[in-house]
């Protein structure tokens, strides 16, 4: 089973146009779902994505990608 990324297209701190291409670089075979993730509180202040049903958040997109890569390499 491949990895799954879920990102919100409505949260203020998440820019789908820049985040999705970065996620594709992390895992080009992963499933990427874009839509509301009901994670609005943290999504106002931090960039986030759900990685295999687990939330991962960071102050910036670049920091988020580093955390996601670390999570997938475990």
From Swiss-Prot:
InterPro entries: DUF1450 (IPR009910), UPF0741 (IPR020880)
Tree of life domain: Bacteria
Family in the record: Belongs to the UPF0741 family.
Protein name: UPF0741 protein BCB4264_A5507
Organism: Bacillus cereus (strain B4264)
């Amino acid at each position: 089973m491949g990895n799954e990324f879920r990102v919100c297209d409505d949260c203020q701190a998440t820019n789908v146009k820049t985040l999705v291409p970065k996620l594709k670089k992390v895992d080009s075979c992963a499933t990427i779902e874009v839509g509301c993730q009901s994670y609005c509180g943290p999504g106002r202040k931090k960039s986030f994505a759900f990685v295999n049903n687990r939330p991962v958040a960071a102050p910036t997109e670049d920091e988020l990608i580093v955390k996601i890569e670390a999570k997938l390499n475990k």
